[in-house]
C-alpha cells in the first residue's frame, strides 16, 4: 500500500457521512486518487469492515450524529474540509444540523455533495427507492433485455454507480475547480434518476433520427442484431460478439467460417434488420460447434470483436487483465485497482478499509480537540474509538 501523497487529489480533504452504495463508492474513487477521506460511521457500526473494500483508503470516525457532541465534531471536521458527501433522504442532514446551510456557515468554500435517487426536489424526492426504480423512470430499464421478455437490470451498475457515483464525483470535481475561481463552495445535487437519464442520451438521439425502434430486443445494441449478441458455445459457456462495423463483421465471418461456400456478396454483407432473426439462428448453430475457449483461441486476438464471458473468478486470471494489473491484492483481499490511470500522478490504494471508529482519537486531535475533550466525548457516547 502507498500513502498516495502524490495522487492528483493529494491534499483534498473529504468528509463522508456513512451510508450505503453510491456515496461511499464516490468517496472511494476520490480516495483512490489521493484525497484524504474521513468516513463518519455510526458508533454501533461493526461488521466485516476488512472485506468492505469500498471503504479502502479512508479513515473512520464513529460519531452519533443525533448527539450534540457527535454533530459538533463533524462540524469541526467540516471547517477544515474541502468536500462533504452525504447520501441521506432530502431533509435528513438538515434535521441533524448538518445540512448545506449549517456547513457552509462554518466553511464557505465547502463543496457539499448530495447523493439521492430522486434528487432534492420533485414529487418523489422523499420516497424510498433503489437502483431498479431509478433506471425504470429513466427509460434505461425498459431498453435492457430481449424481445418479448421482461426488462433485466444490469445488477445495480446503471443507477447506483454509473448514474450515481460517477456523476457525483464529476460534480464534486467541477465544483472544486470553480472554488478556485470564486472562493465559494456550492451544493452538488446528484440524483441517480438524472444520471441514468443522461446515460441514455445517445439512444434518445437515435430515436429522434428514426434509427432506434421502440420495441426492446430489435435494435443494434439490445441483442436484436446477430453481430452484437451473446452466444452459447458447445460447453454451455458463452462468448460476447460485438462486430458492429462492416470490416469487423467481415473478419468475424472469415475467421469463423460463417456461411462457408456462399458467394462473398452474401457471406460478408451485414444482414438487414429484416434478416436478423434468420442470421442469428445460423450463428447460434455455428457457435455451438466449439467450446468457448476454442472460439476464444481462434478469434480473441483478431478484429472480429469476440471475447469470452468470464465469471468473477475467471476474470482474475485473464492474461490481459493480469498484465495491466486490473485487479490487485491488498492486505490479502483481491480487488479492482484504481482507475483511470494517470501517467504522472497515478491513483493508489493507500490504506486498508478501517474498522468503524478506528481513527476517532487521531482525527479528533487533528480537528483541534485535546485529549481531555476527546475522552469526554467518548465517555458521553457521542463518539466511539474502536
Description of each model-found segment:
Residues 32-64:
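Glycine-rich phosphate-binding loop and adjoining beta1-alpha1-beta2 segment
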Amino acid at each position: 500500500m502507498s500513502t498516495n501523497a502524490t495522487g492528483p487529489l493529494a491534499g483534498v480533504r473529504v468528509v463522508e457521512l456513512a451510508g450505503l452504495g453510491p456515496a461511499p463508492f464516490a468517496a472511494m474513487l476520490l480516495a483512490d486518487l489521493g484525497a484524504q477521506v474521513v468516513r463518519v460511521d455510526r458508533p454501533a457500526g461493526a461488521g466485516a469492515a476488512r472485506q468492505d473494500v469500498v471503504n479502502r483508503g479512508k479513515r473512520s470516525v464513529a460519531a452519533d450524529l443525533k448527539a450534540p457532541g457527535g454533530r459538533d465534531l463533524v462540524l469541526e471536521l467540516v471547517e477544515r474540509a474541502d468536500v462533504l458527501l452525504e447520501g441521506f433522504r432530502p431533509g435528513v442532514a438538515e434535521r441533524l444540523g448538518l445540512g448545506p446551510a449549517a456547513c457552509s456557515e462554518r466553511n464557505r468554500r465547502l463543496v457539499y455533495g448530495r447523493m439521492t435517487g430522486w434528487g432534492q426536489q420533485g414529487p418523489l424526492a422523499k420516497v424510498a427507492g433503489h437502483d431498479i426504480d431509478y433506471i425504470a423512470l429513466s427509460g434505461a430499464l425498459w431498453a435492457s433485455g430481449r424481445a418479448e421478455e421482461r426488462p433485466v437490470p444490469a445488477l445495480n451498475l446503471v443507477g447506483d454507480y454509473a448514474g450515481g457515483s460517477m456523476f457525483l464525483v464529476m460534480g464534486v470535481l467541477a465544483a472544486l475547480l470553480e472554488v478556485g475561481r470564486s472562493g465559494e463552495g456550492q451544493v452538488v445535487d446528484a440524483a441517480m434518476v438524472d444520471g441514468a437519464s443522461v446515460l441514455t442520451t445517445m439512444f434518445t438521439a437515435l430515436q429522434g433520427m428514426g434509427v432506434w425502434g421502440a420495441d426492446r430486443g430489435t435494435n443494434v445494441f439490445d441483442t436484436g442484431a446477430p453481430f452484437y449478441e451473446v452466444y452459447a458455445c458447445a460447453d454451455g459457456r458463452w462468448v460476447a460478439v460485438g462486430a458492429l462495423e462492416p470490416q469487423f463483421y467481415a473478419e468475424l465471418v472469415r475467421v469463423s467460417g460463417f456461411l462457408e461456400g456462399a458467394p462473398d456478396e452474401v457471406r460478408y454483407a451485414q444482414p438487414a434488420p429484416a434478416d436478423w432473426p434468420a442470421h442469428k439462428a445460423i450463428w447460434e448453430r455455428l457457435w455451438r460447434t466449439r467450446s468457448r475457449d476454442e472460439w476464444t483461441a481462434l478469434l480473441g486476438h483478431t478484429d472480429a470483436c469476440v471475447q469470452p464471458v468470464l465469471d468473477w473468478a475467471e476474470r482474475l486470471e485473464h492474461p490481459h487483465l493480469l498484465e495491466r494489473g486490473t485487479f490487485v491484492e491488498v492486505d490479502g483481499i483481491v480487488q479492482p485497482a484504481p482507475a483511470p490511470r494517470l501517467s504522472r500522478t497515478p491513483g493508489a490504494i493507500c490504506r486498508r478499509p478501517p474498522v468503524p471508529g478506528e481513527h476517532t482519537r487521531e482525527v479528533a486531535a487533528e480537528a483541534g480537540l485535546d485529549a481531555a475533550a476527546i475522552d469526554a466525548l467518548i465517555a458521553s457516547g457521542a463518539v466511539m474509538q474502536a
